[in-house]
Amino acid sequence: MSGANDIPRQLIVLGDSGVHGWGDREAGGWCQRLRLRWMNLPSAPVVYPLGVRGDGLEHVAARWRREWCCRGELRRQTPGGLLLSVGLNDTARVGRIDGRPQLDVEAFSFGLGQLLNEMTQEMQVFVLGLTAVDEHVMPFAGCLWYANSQIAAMEAVMAEQCREADVPFLSMHQEMQEQSDWLTWMEPDGIHLNADGHRWLDQRLDQWAPLRDWAGLAPYNTSTPISM
């Protein structure tokens, strides 16, 4: 057991089924891959994955503080960092392809701005962008329509709010679609990543300089290509 004086920094990872690792039957998801990689580095922060399937911005905003303030070693100190990965569920349109979104872009932008303002007063915050979806297999669960145009609009306001809050932001949506085989990274439901998708996201995250710098890791060797 660790002593009271040698508790490492913690990285809280908050979000939805992506954080949970849904779809990755090989390694448990990109967050689990990150956790295991850092576990093998003695000086790296401890990763706490706190993803809940179906969560959107409002759900995360309601639970983010109580997730860590009363748990184990976390109840005695504020975590050093928080990685936020949420928003895809908010883009879904309900009932039909032109139905109302779970949360419209303006409301999402306002809510994210408020949430980042709260979070950044307590810890270093990082934000992940949104992954693409396979529109051809919609609707999800028979009633939710996801569209890449809506996801792109949502990610754009995420980037804007992060710039205003001076929070590192890692875009995902366009970068994912630029990969020729990205559709093979999807689960049959069209919204969740499979093991290959989680691997790509994890490798992209591993190269992200702001997170590596905060974690005290050496700069990524850019001569090493991403392999699938």
Which residues are covered by each model-predicted region?
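Alpha-helical cap/lid subdomain in secreted, periplasmic
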Residues: 6-7, 39-43, 61-228
